[in-house]
Amino acid sequence: MTLRLTVSTELWRNHLATTALAYGEMVPVVKGNGYGFGRAALMPEAAKISRTVAVGSVFEVADAPAASTTIVLTPVGIDLPQPLPKQTILTVGSLHHVATLRSGGWVGPVIIKLQSRMLRYGATSAELPDLLAAVRDAGCTQVGWSVHPPLDGAPAQHRDDISQWLAQIDASFPIYVSHLDAESVQQLRSDFKQHRIVARVGTALWLGDKSTMQLHTDVLDTRTVKAGATAGYRNTKISTDGTIVLVGAGSAHGVHTVGDDLSPFHFQRQRLRLLEPSHMHTSMLFMPAGETCAQPGDLVDVQQPLTRVVADTIYWT
């Protein structure tokens, strides 16, 4: 049973270097499943780019290099790990977030999150004065601003959203921005020279050149079946003669259907049919009689966003 991620190491690292150069001052984001590589694999690469790294939650801080300053992107909930490294920077976007830090005894540095059209975390212009006052009263120290536009939308739209904030906020603090391409970041720096604008980059950095990586699983077994038979967890009825192909990847790896319930598995550039939805560590595929059938030991391509996949093995070639 294997879900294998293969990476062309030199080409991948060349992409990292090119991306970092294009963005200028940036903070690599290493969060969640580590963009398919795992957080432990990406942290040393992030340290080559910047002395600061961004993680998704306060529970991911422990993965960051000891010498790094770590920005936590998501506000802290009811559990605040103790102790946190002194170079940790937390994020607040509401009075509730500040109260949570206060109750947890946090008096360290914070970044103020500003609302974007995504309407996730972040203070509005009207809420900002009270939030700043609450941060001061709690004994925390503001060290920056943050704006997180949505993924969708034109670059110009995202620049406009951030520009509105840049016209209002104190330029003595850096502002950290996400989901902007390098050109947009450089344009903002040109338009607002008094501000220090720092790009936070995750997907575009680690996964920006998909040609450098491939995701495969192996065929573990096959079963010849006749029309009318049943198979699988749900006793799915077989509509025609063919072969059930068992591959070593499933929901435990984060592998699911794509688009409109399409199979994520491909063999010899042909999409393979799912007999039933993937389950845990195995997916059951069906190949009608007469088609070239994958055999035990063959590798099957897996079409999945790496942001949700957990590979069993990573081959750095």
Label each residue range with its predicted role:
Residues 3-14, 24-168:
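Active-site-proximal beta-alpha core segment in soluble small-molecule metabolic enzymes
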Residues 3-9, 13-16, 28, 33, ...:
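Active-site anion/phosphate-binding pocket segments in diverse small-molecule metabolic enzymes
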